[in-house]
Amino acid sequence: LNPTDLQVEIKARPPGEAVALAARMVQHRPGPFLGAWAFYTLGTVAVGHLLLRVLHLHWAWVLALVPLLAPIFSLPMTTTAGHLVFSPRVAFRTVAATTIRRGAPFLLLFVANRVLTLLGLAAFVVPGLYLWRASWFLGPVVTLEGSSMEASFRRGRRFAIGFHGHVFGHAFNAAMLLVYLTIAFTSLAHFLVAKVFGQTFTALAELPLQDGYYAYITLVGFALAAPFVTLVWFFVYLDVRIRKEGWDLEIAFRSRAAKMEQGHA
């Protein structure tokens, strides 16, 4: 297929289509995705535990800061998705090699972005919101655009920041859904633990989770959901970029999937 012959209209993919496409991607190569998912989830829980037990922050502050800090563990997830789109035989070693090679610029950009974002939001200035919206694209930009910090920053300005207004609605919808599901999961778990199991198992009161376990349950719920939201957001970003260049993400995926099925035949 010649990209110039497609003449694809440049518009964002609806959230439902992005979720369905992400689910099909995961079904083709579940191993690398599950590994990246576990890395993201365990890293997020570790950060929350550090804030709660080492820095002794109130759980409300922890739940507010974790969404800002957790995406530092997202690079393996976006790397897996990027490799799967362009190379259907993505393996653990490929994802690990790319993550290590591009980890340094990602970390430097992540720290700088979060510091500036917090300063901007603390001062209630527009650049804080601007950087927060642009930071959604940090993982995909570093994953796809190069390993050097200079190249990532230069191309990130061209692709990511230029597109953030176009697909900001997807990020907002995903964030609201994530918050809703987290609250629903937390409320249900709190009811079951406190009202049902607490009446049956007297040893439950002696568990260390009893002290602040509500925060831990919320944290785990977020840590389990965040990788999938990141994955869907990556496909939204990638869809916009591919359409900008005349391609369509669905066509590219079907082509790669067909090649992979032929290879297994």
Which stretches of residues belong to each language-model region?
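Hydrophobic alpha-helical membrane segments
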Residues: 1-265
